[in-house]
Amino acid sequence: MAHTLATPVAPSVSLICNTKLSVSLSSSSLAFRPVNPKNGGGLSIKCVRVGNVEIPNNKRVEYSLQYIHGIGRSRARQILCDLTLENKLTKELSEDELLQVRDEVTKYMIEGDLRRFNAIAIRRLKEIQCYRGVRHIQGLPCRGQRTKNNCRTLKRGKRVQIAGKKKPPGPK
């Protein structure tokens, strides 16, 4: 385990660095001697930003795009087909290919816009008091699923106790 060195730089800021990295402090500047990248130093980028979401760099593009809310398996494949891109690792994409992917993703309703759209649709159902809206209000499934056994995940927030063996009253 590497030892860390904490050196106060300003009253509210402290510098934490590896002991491999040498630090020279003067009154006016802070200078770092570069570390050999073979020894594990240096900057490594682990994510790519597409559609205001950081997608993983070490996975194939088809699976990386699925980290964006609103893009599933079929939509990710459709994006790759529209751009005629190979399904290679995200870090292997060139800048031009990455720009093409970003432009293609902006054509779809994703992330905040999609969440807002769904929230407005559910709010409208609740306001008009239709069956689906009432089921949303009650926290029950609204697509015809059984409720005797399998709607526990929807009712999780309410914590309804399941009828079972009753405990005998304790001694007073």
UniProtKB/Swiss-Prot annotation:
PROSITE patterns: RIBOSOMAL_S13_1, RIBOSOMAL_S13_2. Keywords: Chloroplast, Plastid, Ribonucleoprotein, Ribosomal protein, RNA-binding, rRNA-binding, Transit peptide. One of its GO terms (cellular component) is chloroplast. It is found in: Plastid, Chloroplast. GO terms for biological process: translation. Residues 1-47 form a transit peptide. Gene3D superfamilies: 1.10.8.50, 30s ribosomal protein s13, domain 2. It holds the Pfam family Ribosomal_S13. One of its GO terms (molecular function) is rRNA binding. It comes from the Eukaryota. InterPro entries: Rbsml_uS13_C, Ribosomal_uS13, Ribosomal_uS13-like_H2TH, Ribosomal_uS13_CS. Component of the chloroplast ribosome (chloro-ribosome), a dedicated translation machinery responsible for the synthesis of chloroplast genome-encoded proteins, including proteins of the transcription and translation machinery and components of the photosynthetic apparatus. Component of the chloroplast small ribosomal subunit (SSU). Mature 70S chloroplast ribosomes of higher plants consist of a small (30S) and a large (50S) subunit. The 30S small subunit contains 1 molecule of ribosomal RNA (16S rRNA) and 24 different proteins. The 50S large subunit contains 3 rRNA molecules (23S, 5S and 4.5S rRNA) and 33 different proteins. uS13c interacts with translation factor pY (PSRP1). Belongs to the universal ribosomal protein uS13 family. This is Small ribosomal subunit protein uS13c. It comes from Spinacia oleracea.
